[in-house]
Curated annotation (Swiss-Prot):
Residues 761-786 are cytoplasmic. The gene is RLP30. Residues 1-30 form the signal peptide. Glycans are attached at residues 67, 98, 115, 133, 181, 199, 206, 276, 338, 413, 422, 434, 447, 471, 558, 628, 644, 676. Its main location: membrane. SMART domains: LRR_SD22, LRR_TYP. It holds the Pfam family LRR_1. It is found in: Cell membrane. Belongs to the RLP family. It comes from Arabidopsis thaliana (Mouse-ear cress). This is Receptor-like protein 30. The lineage of its organism: Eukaryota, Viridiplantae, Streptophyta, Embryophyta, Tracheophyta.
Length: 786
């Protein structure tokens, strides 16, 4: 009885098993048939593909799978509905489409599309109104293209949208009132466009589903809504770099879900008032920088315990830092620079990761807790441009992971302590400029291989440069100007592979610059200022023959000159981005460069005791913008090769003993706006170029045999010419480049030098040579511009 029942039960189980298995197979087969892409969908996608000029030899990887022989539901970037087989998602981000979207595009035949992502596709032109026909879209991403026009009217029809991403294009126009139809919108990013808006208060309160809002870098000139508490899902709020006005948006901070707020770069004003901020606030990143907020830092800010990043810089805040800031136990990054804050710097700040308090009126340091001085946290400390005084703060020596230290423009005195060696291993920037530090620059750089920038200028340092600087293999800028350092020229710095800026001006350096055992000079130097020292001797004709960085243009380094006018030395990107600064004589005036332009090339040897000829090899430095050799004892003729310096803006050869003529070809240098040839022994005619004829008379004064100055100085001050002088002016140019040929031969070989020398024995070949030499010296620079 029992065995019979057991067999019956087993049979039932087996039957049920095969029934379920069969059902699953049938369902799978049926489902697989439905997965097939519909023909109309495939044809629409292929039509869309053919609208873009994709090379047959190099088809786009993402579109290479798109062909008639395969199921379009398995094409890359395509997703179909499981049941209907219709395309519901198209993601072609980073595919180089290189065209515009046509009104009749096959794309707009995909009526069931829910997700359309065409970011970074090199799309351009206006977006057609046909976009509004894709009524089922919930996600639209056209970011990072070159699209133009007024797109928002069409987008406003897409009332199912949850994500709208249009950032980094050139869209324009006002946000239409119909935009309020997008009530399901959760993420809105229209940043970095040219949208306008004068009444944000009408639009924003209706978008109650928003969790992320980014309208940064547009042309909005509105106030914020007085009541934003209805945006109860909001986490991210970014209105940076617009022209928003009004008072502090108190209601915004009553939203419990809020995590990130960026109000930077607007025209908000008045005191900072948080109101009844939620006790459960999740706000961790608050940026109110670059506005017109005034009054004190509110004590109530200490109640936002979740804060990690706080930036109140570039406002009109006054008074001390509230002691209650110590309650912000999660705070890691604090920037209060460029305000009118004063008093004591709280010691609790030394436990943070980055502290920026520059350009205020702080005058003392508060007591620090032992935990704040453990040396494990701080990476960046900027106390520049305050009223801090006394000896070097020794507690800084305990900060073992410092990457950037700026104590510039304060009242510190005494010596720089040797214990600073403890903080140099990770150090990338050390700025002690414009204090009253005295004594020797300590030998603390043995382990400072990461140091990019050292500026100790405008102090009272003496002695010699520490030889441990030779270990700073990443050094780009060394500025010891305006001290009383007495040493010979640090020729050993030639071995630093990245040194671009060397400033030794206004010290007591002495001796020669030229050493026989150093054959190739500073290959990467872009700017050198050794003015107002005691250097002496002659400069070899080959002295500048291998200063390659002054020969190579930014265009050749990077393959493109896009944006190079906005690049500055020292700006390295997110890991380290601190601009280098300097002071030097520019266009006859002592000028403070808060940032050093990336393209700037300059040589200032003025105010020394050099004599002999100016090296002809200076004519190789075709990227040079400034050349100042004034106040020396150079003799003989002005090199004809200077006419090759087509980017030269400033030339000062005054107060030497130069003779002969001013080279006629200098008159063709169109950028040469500032020049000085005064107090020499020059003769002959002044070149006729526009830049020469627009100079002040003092540019040529005390050269008694110069003539052609009637338009510049007036007839009463213009000496007359003689036929003899006119004949002397037609001197042969083949003397000019013998030294250049020798310089080239000196490096690559005698044969190259002889060939180039032969070329330059033919008159008027300078530009041809520079073009060829320039091309042969082309380098690829892998470091990013900053």
């Amino acid at each position: 009885m029992i065995p019979s029942q057991s067999n019956s039960f087993s049979g039932s189980v087996i039957t049920l098993y095969f029934f379920l298995l069969g059902s699953l197979v049938l369902r799978t087969l049926a489902s697989s048939r439905l997965h097939y892409c519909r023909h109309d969908q495939r044809d629409a996608l292929l039509e869309f593909k053919h609208e873009f000029p994709v090379s047959e030899s190099k088809p786009s990887p993402s579109l290479s799978s798109w062909n008639k022989t395969s199921d379009c539901c398995f094409w890359e970037g395509v997703t179909c509905d499981d049941e209907s087989g219709e395309v519901v998602s198209l993601d072609l981000s980073y595919v180089l489409l290189n065209n515009s979207l046509k009104p009749t595009s096959g794309l707009f035949k995909l009526q069931q599309l829910q997700n359309l992502t065409l970011s970074d596709c090199h799309l351009y032109g206006e977006v057609t109104s046909s976009l509004g026909n894709l009524s089922r879209l919930t996600h639209l991403d056209l970011s990072s293209n070159q699209l133009t026009g007024e797109v928002l009217a069409s987008v406003s029809k897409l009332n199912q949208l949850r994500d709208l991403l249009l950032s980094e294009n050139s869209f324009s126009g006002n946000i239409p009132t119909s935009f309020t139809n997008l009530t399901k919108l959760s993420s809105l990013d229209i940043s970095s466009n040219q949208f306008t808006l004068e009444n944000f208060s009408f639009i924003l309160p209706n978008l109650t589903s928003l969790s992320s809002l980014n309208v940064a870098s547009n042309h909005f000139k509105s106030t914020l809504p007085s009541d934003m508490s209805g945006l109860h899902n909001l986490k991210y709020f970014d209105v940076r770099e617009n022209s928003f006005v009004g008072t502090f948006p108190t209601s915004l901070f009553t939203i419990p879900s809020l995590q990130i707020v960026y109000l930077e770069g607007n025209q908000f004003m008045g005191p900072i008032k948080f109101g009844n901020i939620s006790s459960s606030s999740r706000l961790w990143d608050l940026n109110l920088a670059d506005n017109k907020f005034d009054g004190p830092i509110p004590e109530y800010i200490s109640e936002i315990h979740s804060l990690i990043v706080l930036d109140l810089s570039h406002n009109n805040l006054v008074g001390p830092i509230p002691t209650s800031i110590s309650k912000l136990v999660n705070l890691q990054h604090l920037s209060l620079s460029n305000n009118t804050l004063e008093g004591e710097v709280p010691g609790c700040l030394w436990g943070l990761m980055t502290v920026t308090l520059s350009h205020n009126s702080f005058n003392s340091f508060g007591k620090s807790s032992s935990g704040a001085l453990d040396g494990e946290s701080m990476q960046e400390l900027d106390l520049g441009s305050n009223s801090l005084g006394g000896p070097f703060p020794h507690w800084i020596c305990k900060q073992r992971f410092l990457k950037y230290l700026d104590l510039s423009n304060n009242l510190f005195n005494g010596s720089i302590p040797p214990c600073l060696k403890n903080s140099t291993y990770w150090l990338k920037g050390l700025v002690l400029r414009n204090n009253s530090f005295s004594g020797f620059l300590p030998d603390v750089f043995v382990n400072a291989s990461m140091l990019l920038s050292l500026d100790v200028s405008y102090n009272r340092l003496e002695g010699k440069l520490p030889k441990s600087l030779i270990n700073c293999t990443g050094m780009e800028l060394l500025n010891v100007g305006s001290n009383i350092i007495k040493d010979t020229f640090p020729s050993w710095l030639v071995s630093l592979p990245s040194l671009r800026v060397l400033i030794l001006r206004s010290n007591a350096f002495y001796g020669s610059l030229y050493y026989d055992h150093i054959s190739f000079g500073f290959q990467h130097l872009r700017l050198i200022d050794i003015s107002q020292n005691g250097f002496s001797g002659t400069l070899s004709p080959l002295y500048f023959s291998n200063w390659r960085e002054m020969v190579t243009s930014v265009l050749e380094e990077n393959g493109s000159n896009i944006g190079t006018e906005d690049w500055y030395m020292g700006e390295k990107g997110p890991e380290f981005s601190h601009s280098n600064s300097m002071t030097m004589i520019y266009k006859g005036v002592e000028t403070d460069f808060l940032r050093i332009p990336y393209f700037f090339r300059a040589i200032d040897f003025s105010g020394n005791r050099f004599f002999g000829n100016i090296p002809e090899s200076v004519g190789l430095l075709k990227e040079l913008r400034l050349l100042n050799l004034s106040g020396n004892s150079f003799t003989s003729n002005i090199p004809q090769s200077l006419a090759n310096l087509t980017n030269l803006e400033t030339l000062d050869l005054s107060r030497n003993q130069l003779s002969g003529h001013i080279p006629r070809d200098l008159g063709s240098l169109s950028f040469l706006s500032t020049m000085n040839f005064s107090h020499n022994l020059l003769e002959g005619p002044v070149p006729l170029g526009t830049q020469f004829q627009s100079q002040h008379c003092s540019t040529f004064m005390d050269n008694l045999r110069l003539y052609g100055l009637e338009k510049i100085c007036g007839k009463a001050h213009a000496p007359s010419s003689t036929p003899l002088e006119s004949e002397e002016f037609s001197e042969p140019e083949e003397q000019v480049i013998n030294w250049i040929a020798a310089a080239i031969a000196y490096g690559p070989g005698v044969f190259c030098g002889l060939v180039i020398g032969h070329i330059f024995f033919t008159a008027h070949k300078h530009e041809w040579f520079m073009e060829k030499f320039h091309r042969n010296k082309r380098r690829v620079v892998t470091t990013s511009a900053r």
